Design a protein with these regions (language model features):
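Aromatic "clamp/platform" in nucleotide-sugar-dependent glycosyltransferases that forms part
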Residues: 322
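Short hydrophobic beta-strand element within catalytic cores of glycosyltransferases
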Residues: 339-342
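Carbohydrate-associated surface elements
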Residues: 204, 225
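A short, well-ordered alpha-helix in the C-terminal region of glycosyltransferases
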Residues: 368, 382-396, 405-408
Length: 423
């Protein structure tokens, strides 16, 4: 089987390409920006400040040979990165991103025909033109979406409900254009219509696709992995009643992560009982942040090597997201020995056994979240047991396991689509 993995940007596409290479099924990994000796990306990186050089260094995968990687529209891809990272260029970002996706799609569809690929795997939000072109030029090629997030059309319904329930937080929901921009909404609909099958990070992602009448028969779930060596485990001890518990949230402090419900749930808890540490970029107005209690600490962004120490010093992780496909921050919390309380709209809920390594609560329900916070405050002696169970939870979620599971899932999807076409 020959499979092409194509992404004009990055996300976790290196991981899937690696999985298929290990299985001997990778026809090519195609992208725009990638670090190779003497290419445009490496030359530009050397000419720019160290910030850009560090970002460029991340555009390389040691598991792939340079010969596995084909680059198209490299200059356009660099322009997308610049527009995304330079504030003065933000207004041009969406136009350049879309035009790059469309130009990239033309090249990949030609590659699919040239290579006689059995399947092409694109990524949600950037594959509408690719799948349409492949359907036209090589209709026998199976078109698979690797869903890095939940269905944007479903998420919009959740966000619209949240706007009505928490209007003061509504502005921070507007940052992800794929949800709101009519052009991107139309592209999402085209992408779903042109795809044959879906590789999903969680049951929640599958459920979100059912909103758009996608048949779950053509969905396969493959959970991501976690690097446990980067997140060491420390055995917890039961804290005394007079010692405050530390609850931690890891992710962007924005309403799409459900922080309004988090702050409401934590309101009125005395500092002598507990504190809430929020680690991540803050995307809320001062009119909200200035009113938070003193035991809610918005730490902001921290260095990657600091994250592990923060998780080791905490007692419980809270993750009240409105919708996340499979947040790696929860897996990092598990690896560090943190019981997790997350919403049903969080893909990592697949990994939680209530009362063992955490709890799953309804989305947009501050009362349910508060009940679980109070449960931990009243059942401190359970935390060491749950901490060990949390760490044990990630044993099955290594990247090596992902490589095997992802390759298996892709093979199943290809066979399902072929069988359906033969009927």
């Amino acid at each position: 089987m020959k499979i092409i993995v194509a992404h004009p940007q990055q996300q976790h596409s290196y991981r899937l390409a690696t999985a298929l290479k290990k299985r001997g099924e990778l026809g090519a990994y195609a992208t725009t920006v990638y670090m190779k000796p003497h290419n445009l990306t490496s030359l530009v990186a050397k000419a720019l400040p160290s910030f850009w050089e560090k970002k460029a260094a991340g555009r390389h995968c040691d598991e792939l040979d340079d010969s596995d990687v084909l680059q198209f529209d490299e200059a356009r891809g660099l322009a997308v990165l610049f527009c995304h990272n330079i504030p003065l260029a933000h207004s041009r970002y969406d136009f350049i991103r879309r035009s790059t996706e469309d130009a990239f799609a033309e090249k990949i569809s030609e590659l699919v025909v040239r290579e006689g690929a059995d399947a092409v795997i694109g990524y949600d939000g950037c594959s509408a033109s690719l799948f349409e072109k492949v359907r036209e030029l090589s209709p026998e090629t199976v078109r698979i979406v690797d869903m890095s997030a939940a269905n944007a059309l479903y998420l919009r319904t959740v966000y619209e409900r949240d706007e009505a329930l928490k209007p003061e937080f509504a502005e921070s929901l507007k940052g992800w254009n794929r949800i709101w921009d009519p052009i991107d909404v139309a592209r999402t609909k085209r992408e779903l219509a042109a795809a044959d099958a879906f590789l999903c990070g969680s049951e929640f992602v599958v459920n979100s696709l059912e909103y758009s009448e996608i048949n779950r028969k053509f969905c396969e779930i493959c959970h991501y992995g976690v690097d446990t060596e980067s997140f060491p485990y420390r055995q917890r001890r039961g804290k005394e009643e007079e010692e405050p518990l530390t609850f931690v949230y890891l992710g962007q402090v924005s309403e799409h992560k459900g922080v309004a419900w988090l702050f409401e749930a934590f309101a009125g808890i005395e500092a002598s009982r507990a504190s809430l540490l929020c680690v991540g970029d803050v995307n809320l107005p001062e009119s909200i942040t200035s009113k938070l209690a003193s035991n809610i600490d918005l730490r902001g962004m921290v260095q990657h090597d600091e994250v592990s120490n923060i998780l080791l010093s905490a007692d419980v992780m809270l993750f009240p997201s409105l919708g996340d496909g499979f947040p790696l921050s929860i897996m990092e919390g598990f690896a560090s020995g943190l019981p997790v309380v997350c919403t049903e709209n969080t893909g990592a809920a697949d990994c939680i056994v209530d009362g063992e390594n955490g709890f799953v609560v309804p989305v947009q329900d501050a009362g349910a979240l508060r009940n679980r916070i109070e449960w931990f405050l009243s059942n401190r002696t359970e935390i060491p047991r749950m901490a060990k169970a949390a760490r044990d939870s990630v044993a099955a979620y290594t990247w090596d396991a992902y490589y095997e599971n992802a390759a298996d899932a892709v093979e199943k999807l290809v066979e399902k689509v072929r069988h359906e076409r033969e009927r």
